[in-house]
Amino acid sequence: MRDDLGITTKLENGKAYLEFALPEKIGRLLSALQIEIWEGAEGERLVFHGEYSSEETDSMTALLLRPHLWDGMRDPYVYLVKAQGRFGTVEYGENMGGIKNQEESDHAEDITEAVEVYWQQELAIYDVHVIDKKGIFLNEKEFLPHEVVYRLPPQISGAGTREEQIKGDLDRLARMGVNAIRLEGTGSGTEGQNRCEVRAFYSLCRRRGFLTDDLWIRPEILPVYRGLPGETMAEALLAADGRTLTERYYYYQAKWSSEPVLYPALPTLHRQENGLLSLSIYSNQKKVVLYVDGVLFLFQSAASGDPEFIFEDIPVAKLPLHLAAEAGNLSISLTVTKL
């Protein structure tokens, strides 16, 4: 079963105009190509059926009225596309995704056999574009990208199958507030990646509401999900062991997530030159309160767009030191035994 039927979409006046394209080196179409579009990822109801002859393969189009739009995290809706046709090939390989059917053919002298080829893939219909000096818009609504660079996990590890790892990664990124993902690389981020793996990854992203387009100018440095052994990267969100989330993960979670966040960044706890302590706390709440040994020490109000609250000159008479932080309905307590 193949998943590489080319599909481009254009939205106009509440209608979706679709154009289909066969992959390269597929062979010559010997029969009508049948294409169906079904509602929902599991194919609940047929909404389009088309048949295209070999003379029409350069202009295979479809029209959907009032399509259900894929709308990111709000509504990651996808259609199911099915297609099949018989193609003449010189040789048969597993990459044809079909069933070998030996038969004599008079379509062309160079066709030695015919293969029935099947496609099944998802279709997300949406519109994303950039308006100069205004921003990015998804389905005519402003879209603020919370984007990370993603590195595919190793094929073999102690953290389960690759698909299981990716699903777990996407769940963590969703909790962090990410809404756009780019595979590591330049441009579309897919250089050097296996095309089947890339399509499978993008399918998982679509189902979870992550945008994977490449239409806007990005900042020079994006946070990277999954560090590498021996690599020193300040923006890595996941350590090289594949299990440990870094401080930067919680920083961006406090910056991007819509869920309440309160996280004391213990690696930032250090003694100042004057002998007192300094500690950073990440939160998306309006105010953070710090207690030292049960006594109110200081509260800080949030600076615009900055999730980091830096508490300085924290007194330490002796160890262990008991700290507690509150923000909104959240609270957390710490016991410091050494510095």
Where are these regions (language model features)?
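Proline/serine/threonine-rich low-complexity linkers at boundaries of modular beta-sandwich domains
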Residues: 1, 252-261
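Secreted/periplasmic carbohydrate-active enzymes, especially glycoside hydrolases
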Residues: 1-184, 188-190, 195-210, 262-339
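Flexible, active-site-adjacent loop/turn segments at secondary-structure boundaries
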Residues: 126, 235-237, 247, 253
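Short hydrophobic/aromatic-rich motifs at helix boundaries and adjacent loops
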Residues: 141-142, 220-225, 260
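Aromatic/acidic polysaccharide-binding cleft in carbohydrate-active enzymes
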Residues: 213-243
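Electropositive phosphate-/nucleotide-binding environments in soluble metabolic enzymes
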Residues: 242-246, 318-320
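Metal-dependent phosphoesterase/phosphodiesterase active-site architecture
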Residues: 243-244, 250, 305-309
